[in-house]
């Protein structure tokens, strides 16, 4: 967001997480998932009575749990006090005030609606859902599939092939969600399919960029160094692979990304 000007008079900056938590009723977490645990180690203030919103598109490594479950398990935050913010919403376009649609998921839909009203604006439209786990898992998987799309791009596969790839990716996502968290959901909604499409195709997508570099022959480490940004899908691939050992869902695209990025590319 280096090209965006912010009104710093309306922003309070702090490097002390405990000071921020003490003064806030609602906490929004956007820390990349690989660093969440280390970041929270500094936390001494109880958060179980706070309203937690996570915009993290990853799974907590080692624990292999989605972020909402981690806050409940480790910090005693009731599920009804945790919401997930998701959807096709690249920060670059939001900062430029381009029309975007976000979904706020929470077991307590009334709380989701309250936050949705606060978040909404002339260029931010919102909807609410109670599919917290499904949306968190889909937010992880779409990054994995964006890496796959990037790899195909780096290998000079055409648009025809990538269309087939994404078509199969949404089916694979649906199989996984229906197995891990069965619910009457429509994966054609923007928070699932829309987020997958924008992450798989957009030039703003870090995961697609990472995959493109891998497809061009970069090692994982060299791609990460050159990008200077976190591609959550790399870490999410390993976590979902571990989780799927307990569910045995047929996931050939996930397996391909895992084999390329974690087995054969160093």
Predicted features along the sequence, with ranges:
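Glycine-rich phosphate-binding loop and adjoining beta1-alpha1-beta2 segment
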Residues: 1-4
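Rossmann-like NAD(P)(H) cofactor-binding subdomain of soluble oxidoreductases
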Residues: 7, 14-22, 26-97, 115-117
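Fold-independent oxyanion-binding glycine-rich loops
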Residues: 16, 31-32, 55-57, 85-88, ...
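Conserved small/polar residues in nucleotide/adenosyl-binding loops
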Residues: 264-265
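Interdomain hinge/lid region at the active-site interface
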Residues: 145-146, 151-258
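Internal alpha-helical scaffold of NAD(P)-dependent oxidoreductase catalytic cores
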Residues: 46, 73-81, 99-186
